[in-house]
Each structure stands twice: as C-alpha cells, then as structure tokens.
Amino acid sequence: MATFPPLPMTHTRLAILARQKLPCSSKKIPRAQLIKEKEDIDYYLEQNFKGLSKEEVAAHRNSYKKSICVDMLRDGFHKSFTELFALMEQWDKLPEAAKAQSLFWQQRPLEDQPDKLDNFYHYLTRAEAAERKGYYEEVYNNLYALACYFDNSEDKWVRNHFYERCFNIAQLIKADGGKKEAEAESHMGLLFEEEGELLKAAEHYEAFHELTHGRLWKDGTGQLLNLVACESLVRTYRLLSDRMLENKDYKQAIKILIKASEIAREGNDRSMEGEASYYLGLAHLASGEYETALTVLNRYSEISTSLDDDHGLGRAYEAIAKALQSQGETTEAINYLEKFVTIARNNLQSLDMIRACTMLGDIYNEKGQYSKASEYFQQAFSTAMELMKTALMDETKVHYGIARAHQMMLAMKGYIESADSNGLNCLLSWKETRTQIEYDPILGESRRATEDNIYQLPDAEEETRRSPENQ
C-alpha cells in the first residue's frame, strides 16, 4: 500500500517552546535557557494577547498572598512587607503548635482569606506612608483599625500585636494632650487582663486612670474615658483580691479592695460603688472582722435600696445574715434571710431561693426547731427539682432527709422511753411498713406522738425537749 508523505505542521513560537519542555523530552535544558524561555513566553503573551500585561500574568500564576507581598515591595513599602511576612510566618506555625497540644485547629490558612490580606495591605501601607511624613496620629488610627478588624476569638493574637504597635506609636503623639496614649494604656490593660497577668494589667489601668483624671474625653460610644478607667481598675483589683483571699492573704486583699472602693466613689457611679462595698464586706467577713463587715455591707444595702436593685439587696441581706450568724445573733440572721427568700421568690431567682432556704434550714436545725428546718429544706428541694439540676437535687434532698429524720427522732424517743408493749408494737409496726405511725391514745399525748403530729409540733416544744435539762 502506498503511503503519503507527512503533512507539514506549522507551530507557533509558544507551542515550540512548550513542546521542548514536555516531560517526555530526553533533552536536559540548562537553567539559563529556561529563564530565557520564560522571558520569551512572557513577551509572546504580551504581544499576541492584547490587554494581558506581565503583571496580570504574574497575578494568575502566583498565589494571592504572594501577589500582596510583591505589590508591597514594588510600591516601596518594605516595612509593611517585613511586618506582614513575620505575621504570616507566625500564622503558619499555629496549626503545628495546636497539634503539639493535641488541639483541633479549624482556622483556614491565610491565603484562603483574601479579605484579611486586603486589610493588611490597605492599612499597613497607609500607616507606613503616614509614618514617613511624621503623621503619628494617622499611623495610630490605621493600626488601631487593624486591631479592631481582628478583634475576634480566632485572631485575638493578631489584635494584640497591633495593640502593642498602637501603644508604641501613642508615646510619640503629643498634640492631643495624651488621649491616644490613654486609649493605648486601656488596650494593653485589657490584653494582660485576658491573659491572666493581673499585676501588669493593673499597671496599665492605673496609667489609664491617671491620664484621664479630670478629663472629659469620651470613647466611640460616648462614655467618659475616666469612668471606663475606674471600672477597669475596680474590676482588676477585685480579681487580684480573689487570688489573695484564696491564699488567705486577708490584709492585702482588704487593702486593695479599699483602693477599689475609693476609685469607685471617684467615678460617681453608685452601682460600681455598691459592688466595691460588697466585695470589701466579704473580705472583712472572711478575715473574721464581723463588725466592720456589717458596716460596709449595710452601706451596700443602702446603695442597692436607693437604686431599686433587688438583686443587690438580696446579696446584701445574705452577706449580712452570714456576719450575724458568725456573731451568734441567729434571730437577726433569720430576719435578713427571710427577706432574702422574699426577694428571691418575687424575682424568680431560683438559685438564690435554694441558697437562702438552705441557710435558714441549717439555722433552725441547729436550734432544734426541726419542723421549721424541714419546711425550708423542702422548699429548697422543690426548687431544685424545678431546675432539674442533679447536683443541687442531691444536696437539698440530703438536707431535707436529715431534717425529716430529726422530726421523727422525738416521736421514736417517746415510744422507746415508754418501755411498754404498746410502744414496742408501734415501733415494730413502723419498722415493717415504714409508713406513718398511727397515734394510739392509750400511750398518752404527753410523751408520745405520731409522725403527723411531730410534723406540726410547735418549735418551742421541740426546743424544750432537746434542751440539756430535759435530757
């Protein structure tokens, strides 16, 4: 069979270059030739595909993250590139650090989040341009905008980085009288507070408070910066005092809470002043200074009353009752706890209700008034049942059971002391059935009672029977 000669094929320059680089080619191409061929391809694309520039080709060839870095360098923002590159390196190390701690890392890589890269480019380059001109307030504003953009649980470390940058730049701003410096101190205080370094947080909040003292500066929400400083400082002092109280360092805890109370009064905020008084009163109570605790807690009670703050008033009554009980003044303590129960019931504060009823039950149980104790423990148990909290149900159930047992104890004691067959039969009958004991008038009302009668036994009679003289 006759064969036809092969048809002549014409190839473009681009196709020729591409075919020469196919992996099936056995020809080894030197590096210099590869670079030249790349330049030839770029030139060919630029000449034959109008509207597709060399930069556009690079944009399609490179990742978006690399393109952002290239743009920064091409536009002359070398400091911005250095800062962004360092943040990128740290970002890439986060999954490895999480894996070392056996944590599941869910955050996407930075190259998959173009919006964040755009914000980096926009604000970092603007900040660098302003810094070159000496416009430090504009530098601060751009860096703070980045801190606000990254203020979320995933990127908090990025936010903290820009908080530190803002703090350093704020030291150079003198035209605003120190307002930016005060804001930067506030942000650094928050940074350390969230990390649990309360002493460093207190230092920054103290500087924030000092810079805003006597100033009418306001934040973005219209709140006075001095009030924000007072609130931040009082909160940090309280957290520090909690640690001191855990370590039984009552003197230092009281000392720092007194400072918190003074700052709260300076802020002219009655609610904050009341909170400071409450925690100071608790510190005095923990240290055994009951009279001082009562004085401070009564002030908190007065403030809560003036503010119509039922929750605060209930807390005040609870703490005052504890102080009175520690002094042995149980009657006064009962009065305050009954007020606490009323407030908790009216405001549907179930946990407060359980706590108040349990405290009342304990007091009546110690006094030997078992009917009252059983009544309050039953209220606590019923409230815990409504909440369906297993731990609370178990605890209140035990208290209620003990109070019921104490009620029955007097009836059992009466039957045992009767020392006759009727009393013995009643005891045996109860042991077999564990039901309510039927009252037998033959045994006499003076020394014996059924379980029903014991539940309604006057508290005075119970206390008399329990007294050492009667025993």
From Swiss-Prot:
Q: Can you supply a Gene Ontology BP term from the record?
A: cilium movement
Where are the TPR-type repeats located?
92-131, 136-173, 182-215, 234-267, 274-307, 314-347, 354-387
Q: What happens when the gene is disrupted?
A: Knockout mice generated by CRISPR-Cas9-mediated gene editing display minor morphologic and ultrastructural defects of sperm flagella, which result in profound alterations in sperm flagellar velocity and beating frequency that strongly impair fertilization.
GO CC terms for this protein? Answer: cytoplasm; cytoskeleton; sperm flagellum
Keywords, sorted A to Z: Cell projection, Cilium, Cytoplasm, Cytoskeleton, Flagellum, Repeat, TPR repeat
Question: Per the record, which residues fall in region Disordered?
Answer: 449-471
Gene3D superfamilies, alphabetized: Tetratricopeptide repeat domain (1.25.40.10)
Location in or out of the cell: Cytoplasm, Cytoskeleton, Flagellum axoneme
- List, alphabetically, the InterPro entries matched: Bac_ResReg_Asp_Phosphatase, TPR-like_helical_dom_sf, TPR_rpt
Give the top-rank taxon of the lineage listed in the UniProt record for this protein: Eukaryota
Tell me which tissues or organs this protein is expressed in.
Expressed in spermatozoa (at protein level).
Any Pfam family from its record, for instance, is TPR_12
Known PANTHER family for this protein? TETRATRICOPEPTIDE REPEAT PROTEIN 29
Q: What is known of its domains?
A: The TPR repeats are required for axonemal localization and flagellar beating.
What the protein does comes down to:
Axonemal protein which is implicated in axonemal and/or peri-axonemal structure assembly and regulates flagellum assembly and beating and therefore sperm motility.
Protein's name according to its UniProt entry: Tetratricopeptide repeat protein 29
Tell me which species this is from. Mus musculus
**Originating gene:** Ttc29
